[in-house]
Curated annotation (Swiss-Prot):
Annotated EC: 3.1.-.-
GO cellular component: cytoplasm
Alphabetical GO biological process terms: rRNA processing
Similarity comment: family membership: Belongs to the endoribonuclease YbeY family.
Signal peptide: none
Cofactors required: Zn(2+)
Primary localization class, coarse: cytoplasm
PROSITE patterns recorded: UPF0054 (PS01306)
Keywords attached to this entry: Cytoplasm, Endonuclease, Hydrolase, Metal-binding, Nuclease, Ribosome biogenesis, rRNA processing, Zinc
Taxonomic source organism: Buchnera aphidicola subsp. Schizaphis graminum (strain Sg)
Keyword DNA damage assigned: no
GO molecular function, one term: metalloendopeptidase activity
Record lineage: Bacteria, Pseudomonadati, Pseudomonadota, Gammaproteobacteria, Enterobacterales
Function statement: Single strand-specific metallo-endoribonuclease involved in late-stage 70S ribosome quality control and in maturation of the 3' terminus of the 16S rRNA.
Protein name stated in the entry: Endoribonuclease YbeY
Amino acid sequence: MKKKNNIILTIQKNCKNTKNIPKKYIFEKWIKKVLYKKKNVNLINIRIVDEREMKNINLKYRGKNKSTNILSFKFDLFINKNQTLLGDLVLCKKIIEKESLKYQKTLESRWAHMIIHGTLHLLGYDHKNKKEKKIMEKIENKIMLFLNYEKPYFMKSS
């Protein structure tokens, strides 16, 4: 029997303005598209923060004294035979809003892309070199198109 819901999602909002943050079921929809092959129940925590908190977290964990759009903290902690804590996604609302304008994407599309990108990191994907980056971007493009959003990356056809 197929499991109906393969994620347990908690969301913390730690920013003054919570307007235009997607609803929990929307986050779940995006994450499920990334985790569609996973059989376990996967626990993910999302924390939505302001630029100051993001800057502090980025400095503490990556040594970078600036805010960023998303940080992923992979745990992949086996809780029991049916549950895995995949990790945490920390998103900066203000930067996502700025980037949606900068890249001329809808705000919803930018949120979707960041959640997909972060969830792929929780699964072990990365973009530290050209080969990894190409693989990850191809998956992100495919999922975004499947969800009826524009490609976040415009890739040259090979």
